[in-house]
């Protein structure tokens, strides 16, 4: 999602990209096998990684010259950071489609995808707690159209129109 907003002229940052900078891919794969089967190990990893991610996000926001910046945080509600932002956008998809996409684009097994989804807040709850909701249940082109429409709404709202 960050890329699509960036293509529309917004300055963006993505929490997942920060994690990818902190933890090498082979280490992420190894850790995933542990943390998605061991809640205590997951909490320990999050306690180490989340403060670094939050610090980088706060630094990014503080250094922006173009407003509003777009910050993508897939686990926003789970980590309790929604108060850092003026508005919250949530992208939701049906669970079966999430699983299908995770398996086809990331190479996860169905079991791995299901464990990742189960470790997160249900999308319905995220949607209720959000200011804007984008339903991503179609093509990339349709998603881009929805993001472009929302980008215009955000610009209008930010300008006070």
Regions flagged by a language model, labelled:
Residues 1-34, 145, 152-161:
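Glycine-rich phosphate-binding loop of ATP-dependent small-molecule kinases
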Residues 34, 48, 101-102, 116:
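Amphipathic alpha-helical segments that mediate coupling or scaffolding at interfaces
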Residues 11, 33, 87, 131-132:
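Well-ordered beta-strand positions
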Residues 8, 28, 95-103, 110, ...:
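An amphipathic alpha-helix signature
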Residues 56-62, 69-105:
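ATP-dependent NMP and nucleoside kinases share a basic, alpha-helical "lid"
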Residues 56-57, 65, 83-84, 104, ...:
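Small-molecule kinase domains that catalyze NTP-dependent phosphoryl transfer to phosphate-bearing small molecules
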Residues 16, 45, 70, 134, ...:
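Residue-level signal for inorganic ion chemistry
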Residues 11-67:
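ATP-dependent small-molecule kinase phosphotransfer cores
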């Amino acid at each position: 999602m960050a890329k699509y907003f960036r293509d529309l002229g917004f300055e963006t940052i993505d929490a997942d990209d920060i994690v990818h900078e902190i933890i090498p891919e082979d280490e992420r794969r190894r850790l995933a096998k542990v943390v998605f089967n061991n809640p205590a190990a997951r909490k320990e990893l999050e306690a180490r990684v989340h403060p670094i991610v939050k610090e980088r996000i706060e630094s990014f926001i503080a250094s922006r010259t173009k407003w509003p910046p777009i910050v993508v945080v897939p686990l926003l509600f789970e980590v309790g950071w929604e108060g850092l932002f003026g508005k919250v956008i949530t992208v939701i998809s049906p669970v079966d489609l999430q699983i299908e996409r995770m398996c086809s684009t990331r190479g996860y097994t169905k079991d791995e995808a299901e464990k990742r989804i189960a470790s997160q807040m249900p999308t319905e709850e995220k949607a209720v707690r959000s200011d804007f909701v984008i339903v991503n249940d179609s093509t990339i082109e349709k998603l881009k159209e929805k993001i472009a429409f929302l980008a215009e709404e955000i610009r209008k709202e930010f300008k006070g129109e």
